[in-house]
């Protein structure tokens, strides 16, 4: 802040959470830990204990970083486990959802409610733009091929942080 720069932490969930899941296997859908077809296994949003863990992680982050925004990630979620998980399927029914995509949107909205209740605003990768976030949220647009994300976010009153992958990924030329 002294130099006009805020370091905004990102704790990516519900996907990209394998480091935590490896240490706390109960965070995942039962017996479904490791790599899926494309990405690592996500947390199990069907378990209340997993939701509490996620909130506890962010409580600590909120205490450490005094900034208005905190990044929750939300990108590249492997949802195949959720299709097989009885707890996730129960959550889908209980919440009146229709699909695992709706389950992710529910999780993101639930986390945003938690953020706002704690005086913070959520930032998410552009995959969460259609999840029904409030105008308090901000979207980080990284998928330059996803042209609809920016107009969708701004039409919902959300701020957009533009960081298209081909220009802002330092390893892009080597990847």
Give the residues covered by each predicted segment.
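Substrate-binding cleft of carbohydrate-active enzyme catalytic domains
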Residues: 1-120
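Hydrophobic faces of well-ordered beta-strands that scaffold small-molecule active sites
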Residues: 7-11, 70-72, 122-124, 137-141, ...
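A glycine-rich phosphate-binding loop feature that marks nucleotide/adenosyl-phosphate handling sites
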Residues: 13-17, 71-77, 127-133, 166-171
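Alpha-helix boundary/interfacial micro-motifs
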Residues: 20-21, 27-29, 91-92, 136, ...
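Generic preference for hydrophobic/aromatic residues in regular secondary structure cores
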Residues: 27, 43-45, 125-128, 169-170
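Generic recognition of flexible, low-complexity loop/linker segments
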Residues: 59-61, 111, 126-128, 148-150
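Charged, low-complexity surface patches
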Residues: 104, 141-142
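Conserved alpha/beta catalytic core and glycan-binding cleft of carbohydrate-active enzymes
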Residues: 129-134, 142-175
């Amino acid at each position: 802040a002294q130099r006009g720069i805020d370091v905004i932490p990102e704790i990516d969930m519900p996907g990209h959470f394998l480091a935590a899941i490896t240490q706390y296997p109960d965070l995942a859908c039962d017996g479904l830990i490791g790599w899926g077809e494309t990405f690592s296994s996500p947390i199990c949003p069907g378990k209340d204990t997993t939701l509490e863990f996620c909130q506890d992680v962010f409580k600590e982050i909120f205490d450490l970083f005094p900034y208005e925004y905190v990044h929750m990630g939300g990108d590249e979620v492997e949802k195949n486990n959720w299709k097989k998980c009885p707890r996730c399927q129960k959550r889908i029914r209980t919440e009146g959802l229709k699909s695992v995509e709706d389950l992710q949107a529910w999780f993101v909205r639930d986390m945003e409610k938690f953020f706002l209740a704690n005086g913070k605003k959520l930032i998410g990768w552009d995959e969460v733009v259609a999840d029904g976030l409030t105008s308090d949220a901000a979207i980080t647009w990284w998928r330059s091929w996803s042209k609809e994300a920016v107009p969708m976010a701004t039409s919902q009153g959300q701020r957009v942080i533009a960081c298209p992958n081909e220009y802002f990924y330092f390893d892009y030329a080597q990847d």
